[in-house]
Curated annotation (Swiss-Prot):
Record HAMAP family: Ala_tRNA_synth_B
Reactions catalysed: tRNA(Ala) + L-alanine + ATP = L-alanyl-tRNA(Ala) + AMP + diphosphate
Source domain of life: Bacteria
Cofactor names: Zn(2+)
Example of a GO cellular component annotation carried by this entry: cytosol
PANTHER family for the chain: ALANINE--TRNA LIGASE, CYTOPLASMIC, ALANYL-TRNA SYNTHETASE
Metal-binding is among the record's keywords: yes
Family: Belongs to the class-II aminoacyl-tRNA synthetase family.
One record GO biological process: alanyl-tRNA aminoacylation
Chief subcellular location: cytoplasm
Gene responsible for this protein: alaS
GO molecular function: alanine-tRNA ligase activity; aminoacyl-tRNA deacylase activity; ATP binding; tRNA binding; zinc ion binding
Protein name: Alanine--tRNA ligase
The record's free-text note on cofactor binding: Binds 1 zinc ion per subunit.
Amino acid sequence: MKAAEIREKFLKFFESKGHTIVRSSSLVPGNDPTLMFTNSGMVQFKDVFLGTDPRPYSRATTAQRSVRAGGKHNDLENVGYTARHHTFFEMLGNFSFGDYFKHDAIKFAWELLTTVYQLPKDKLWVTVYQEDDEAYDIWAKEVGVPTERIIRIGDNKGARYASDNFWTMGDTGPCGPCTEIFYDHGPDVWGGPPGSPEEDGDRYIEIWNLVFMQFNRDAQGNMTRLPKQSVDTGMGLERLAAVLQHVHSNYEIDLFQNLIKAAARVTEISDLTNNSLKVIADHIRACSFLIVDGVIPGNEGRGYVLRRIVRRAIRHGYKLGRKGSFFHKLVADLVAEMGVAYPELKEAEQRVTDVLRQEEERFFETIEHGMSILEGALADVEAKGGKVLDGELAFKLHDTYGFPLDLTADVCRERGMTVDEPAFDDAMARQREQARAAGKFKAAQGLEYTGAKTTFHGYEEIAFDDAKIVALYVDGSSVNEVKTGQDAVVVLDHTPFYAESGGQVGDQGVLANAATRFAVADTLKVQADVIGHHGTLEQGTLKVGDVLRAEIDAHRRARTQRNHSATHLMHKALREVLGAHVQQKGSLVDAEKTRFDFAHNAPMTDDEIRRVEQIVNNEILANAPGIVRVMPYDEAVKGGAMALFGEKYGDEVRVLDLGFSRELCGGTHVSRSGDIGFFKIVVEGGVAAGIRRVEAITGDNAVRYVQELDARVNEAAAALKAQPSELTQRIAQVQDQVKSLEKELGALKSKLASSQGDELAQQAVEIGGVFVLAATLDGADAKTLRETVDKLKDKLKSAAIVLAAVESGKVSLIAGVTPDASKKVKAGELVNFVAQQVGGKGGGRPDMAQAGGTEPANLPGALAGVKGWVEERL
């Protein structure tokens, strides 16, 4: 039974039991910012279990895409070297939200395993929590599992309820016992049953975990029964497939074998047991689906994890002798394996391929030199009988050649060596310190300051007359004097300048007296309550102790305040229009615009955007006062003030009431909502799976935007010789004309193809009574290629044909074989023979197949090989 069939049977079985099939959620959790990646089926239902996300169903089933390659759940180092470690895996699960409980969950599992999948009952063992007599009795008395194959697992992790068979969501909250189902591979495989000293062997393999959310645990550790008891189960598709396909390694199942063969093809390796092929086959799944879900290779967070996985795959290809890019060529193979189950993968195929190709090209620019240095260093260490690579060298590889430490450690591990990571960390710390001292300041953090805190007057004033300099910094070092032309950071005892925080940019302005002028380009925090003014001394000298007038750029501040206050109103409006699930995930407020990232799973419609704009502008017209109060945090939240995820708040907080909005905020704002003037959303898009971004403008910027838009509408109307009010109708007419012209063009192409077909027929070569033709048809589209192939088949009577066309760097291929020849020459195999050489893959019927490719430079050679390929099969 193939993996695809196993997945389908699972979902269909639970659908027949009244479950709703729910699509896999994104690998980027939209409801749990504490998670790096979705790593289990229950992640998308966490809020459902907690009762904060009501759904129209009480039973659900999923095949959930999952990744474990960062943070707590990090299997990366073991991937490719063990039978069951993966970065990406599929978790099959069924869920009950206050519906059925232990009886049905256990009976469903047993029926599916023994009846649908037809696993031998005597091969299945189960574990239960030591105190869960209910589950034990269901297994023993109702299901009929012999008691010698039911194992009670106690508190084996050092504390009460700390057990492999007791699940918790956290220190407090929902929790409960679980029961696990194991498959016995038989006495020929080493290992003992769960709970025995030999349980880590491969004989008994856990295939399904059934979690019973039965209790709520409070802060004192007291357990009370939940009013709605729920079920969360998880079964790894790859593990189940290994059992059903009678193999002992997940890498031996059909899905992985096909990917391993594809990896062998692109790396030109014949040994399918090579661990590096397993690494590559695993990593193409994780990388492709992460990119599908909006993760892009980068230097931090999820992007960095993705980059690590990509580079590890590339390094294993390099190890196999592949010195050029190859990894991106596997995307088409993955789509062939998983594109039906996950159509989003097929839809994003080209984007995934492009991202991986770019990352490969970028890394291959550095890997060859870095690898030669690393291999030479390892040889030196081995020659001296050592086992540890110098951390300074590892840092050089990282700093100079972009070689990640984990990749260096991976190479060392294969040679039985380690990296001196403390020495690496020391070198990294020194480099950061040097960069901080040598570079121009972007931030004031890291400056050594031991004086008094800065008193901030910016909520009430735009200038302060008697501000005294208490510290000066040039190039990261404390100085007593700054000279004309120098960049510096100035710390004052009093200031009206707002330091960048909470998404609002820092103020600009001037520090001056009769002899001195310092232009402030940015304001940042040196410490939590110490403000640094970063800029350039344009006139005179500055000394510690000097007294200055500190004056902000009032016009810039006013525009920034308008945008910040509008952000609060927009946040509230988004929650009203889209739902209470909308949470701020990031923001940037400056004088030009407000940029707001928030949790939401779908693009906003035009109607939703208009409604948000209308709500905000109605609040602006109401001209409500901005009321600021300082109060204890708990009191503020209890009073309905919104606290933003990721922000840090002290015991005392600043609460802003502006119209219908109430938020905790330390930023600067308008006095009344009417001061915002006018609000307009100009951009809405996605920045990651489950995260949307809105950019909006206010005041004079918004008015200017509408005026420019109006001017463009008038220009477009003039170009189409219509009034602005007639634009929609006129555009529809133009579109109809274009369609008509395209139809005429298609007819002309068809005629051209027919005439070219007559010429091409004369190029066909007869082999064993079959005419063979492989040629390029200039300017043809896929439809024209198909029509030409059909006409050639009719003309030649007995033929095997491949026609190609190239447009915008992409290759289109069509293969056609007449019925008499298709018994020996399959069109699908023929087109794949050519496609694989031009960076693609395809398929179809024995008589007609199509494919694409991304490497047109290889097309002439690929077509030249068709004659020999066909000749071998006739």
